[in-house]
Amino acid sequence: MVEAILRSTLGARTTVMAALSYLSVLCFVPLLVDRDDEFVYFHAKQGLVIWMWGVLALFALHVPVLGKWIFGFSSMGVLVFSLLGLVSVVFQRAWKLPVVSWVADRI
């Protein structure tokens, strides 16, 4: 599917829109604006899953004692996966991030 997209066919707009997918709440911009582009849509779905994970991590702060630990580890995971997603966009690849892509495929 996405692997069939060649590097030379991706323009600057596509790269910027795909990169926005991994910047927190800005993941909604590519989902709403550039839904027809398969490369952007792939990254937008993964970015949406990462954003939802971050929002759920905030709710973990309400759990006594363990909430701070859960939030800390989840925040690190969100940061790492967002950076990996941005790197894959810069290299113009469609890397399936572990667990994130599994959830994104079911959206």
Swiss-Prot record:
Subcellular location: Magnetosome membrane
Disulfide bridges in this chain: none
Primary site of residence: membrane
First and last residue of the signal peptide: none
Cytoplasmic side: 1-13, 68-69
Knockout mutant characteristics: Intermediate magnetic response, slightly smaller magnetosomes. Double mamF-mmsF and double mms6-mmsF deletions have a normal magnetic response, slightly smaller, fewer magnetosomes. Deletion of the 4 gene operon (mms6, mmsF, mms36 and mms48) gives an intermediate magnetic response with fewer, smaller magnetosomes in irregular pseudo-chains.
Induction data: Part of the probable mms6 operon.
Single GO cellular component term: magnetosome membrane
Keyword Cell membrane: no
Membrane protein topology class: Multi-pass membrane protein
UniProt entry keywords in alphabetical sequence: Biomineralization, Magnetosome, Membrane, Transmembrane, Transmembrane helix
Transmembrane annotation, as ranges: 14-34, 47-67, 70-90
Function summary: Plays a role in regulating magnetite crystal size; partially redundant function with MamF.
Note: This bacteria makes up to 60 cubo-octahedral magnetosomes of about 45 nm in diameter which contain membrane-bound crystals of magnetite (Fe(3)O(4)).
Protein name: Magnetosome protein MmsF
